[in-house]
Amino acid sequence: MKRIILLLLALVLVLALMACGGKEPEDAADAADNSTLSNSAQLSITEASYLEYDNSQITCRFRKDEDGWKWVDNEGFPLDAAYIEETLAALDAMSASLTPVEPAVEAADAGLDDAQRYLTVTVGEETTTLRFGDQKDDGQWYMAIDGQEGTYLVADEFVQRMDRSVYSMAVLPTLPELTDENLTVITLRSGAEDKAVRLTKTDEGWFRENRQVTEQVQAMEAALADFTFDSCFNYDPSPDAAPLCGLDAPTATITAAYVNTVGTETTLTLTLGTLREDGSYYVTLNDDTTVYLVSQDKVAAFLALL
């Protein structure tokens, strides 16, 4: 009798262990379901190979190959991929916490029947598209996922990431080191008045014709040392861009002759177009047609001599 009781207890224990073991796959399945944007390859969204977003005004498309991320519309564009990677990381984090709105909301009531914003991401072999509808009073946006029935709410901070244009992701050029040690001549030319100023360095300092202008040149040297482009305005522009930006008849042209690191004299030219209402000039660098924006205070020291 005692042996029978022990056998029964052992059987109960085995059944209990089987029940516990049987629950683990169910929990794992639930966890997988909670990853709303999961894919069959179980890759992280940060491993995506394609990203596209549209906010009804701008469309940005990017693809990744062995050399990194590229802008699909012009793969020669000097793209800083940091913003793309940040967006994918934000999408990955958002996906882990998405839950459908309860009670359910009709697509028409959430602005999803005619969504004006979308984001598409490709991870492995799978492509997922998110569509964004109306924004609620609390700032959140309704979102739907193509191929799924649920409606979700996402933070405004994430949706705002689709408001950034590709030009704001450009790697901006930098000027070579230009100091009193390697500068030899600075030439300023005003397009409007056809006026030219040539500043030449001698052993006694900087001169404009026969008048010493060392102090004025020091201000220009400081401006050159701190000079940075504010943003990219137009990359690989059409021929119409130059007259539209006032670069066909520039406000001023600044040319600096200097001795480079290998001991050869070379030149650098900044061409200033129209002054915009926001206080920035359209600017090009050397023979590159890319148009940049530069605030007027960065070139004030040069224009003061014209």
Predicted regions and their residues:
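C-terminal motif of bacterial Sec signal peptides marking the signal peptidase cleavage site
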Residues: A16-A19
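Core hydrophobic alpha-helical membrane-spanning segments
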Residues: L8-V14
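A short-motif feature that recognizes glycine-rich, charge-decorated loops
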Residues: I5-L8, G21-L306
